[in-house]
A protein has these predicted regions:
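Positively charged n-region of N-terminal signal peptides that target proteins for export
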Residues: 2-8
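Sec-dependent N-terminal signal peptides
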Residues: 8-17
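Bacterial Sec-dependent signal peptides at the C-terminal "C-region" and cleavage site
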Residues: 18-26
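A short beta-strand-turn-helix
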Residues: 30-48
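Short active-site neighborhood of thiol/selenol oxidoreductases, capturing the structured segment around
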Residues: 44-58
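Solvent-exposed loop/turn segments at secondary-structure junctions
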Residues: 54-59, 67, 88-93, 141-142, ...
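C-type cytochrome heme c attachment motif
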Residues: 55-62, 133-135
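Thioredoxin-like thiol-disulfide oxidoreductase module
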Residues: 71-74, 78-144, 163
Length: 165
């Protein structure tokens, strides 16, 4: 009897922790590593959502602090995409589609350099790159759409819903 009471007490103590971890996952976007998102999208009908940002970017921070915290945006992204956050000016090599991409000009913060993966997936707009940029890629690594600049909640929902079938 004493042993079963201890087990029951242990279960009751753990239940709130299980609920807490599940609710935490629903309150934020489940950002993945690129390799994991690639693996999952190859086996699924879900596309990857690649969010390219850079440090000290006002609009990138607005996306993170305003758009990506909205419950309806979180649900739409978590339910329909494999999201990945990528620093478009990273100095680290990035493996994508079994190919290594580097930043071949990692100069000072003032230099207009970009990671080669960013340059491969993001098309210039009016002879410029804009931050942040969202690129939707399917499991065959084909780009479906790209959108640049700050997207408020309504625009994010509208743009992403147009992709989800």
């Amino acid at each position: 009897y004493y042993c079963s009471m201890k087990k029951l007490l242990l279960i009751l103590l753990c239940l709130p922790l299980i609920g807490l971890t599940q609710s935490t996952n629903n309150n934020s976007i489940n950002w993945l590593e690129l390799a994991e998102a690639e693996r999952l999208s190859e086996k699924s009908s879900k596309n990857m959502l690649l969010f390219f940002y850079r440090e000290n970017c006002e609009y990138c921070e607005k996306m993170k602090s305003q758009t990506f915290i909205d419950p309806s945006v979180i649900k739409l992204i978590n339910d329909n995409f494999f999201p990945v956050m990528i620093n478009g000016k990273s100095k680290d090599p990035i493996i994508y589609n079994k190919e290594e991409f580097i930043n071949d000009k990692p100069n000072s913060e003032d230099e207009p350099y970009f990671h080669n993966l960013f340059k491969k997936l993001v098309e210039m707009k009016n002879d410029n790159y804009y931050w942040p940029t969202i690129v939707i890629v399917n499991g065959e690594k084909k780009k479906i759409i790209q959108g640049s600049g700050f997207w408020p909640k309504e625009q994010t929902l509208r743009n992403l819903r147009s992709i989800v079938k």
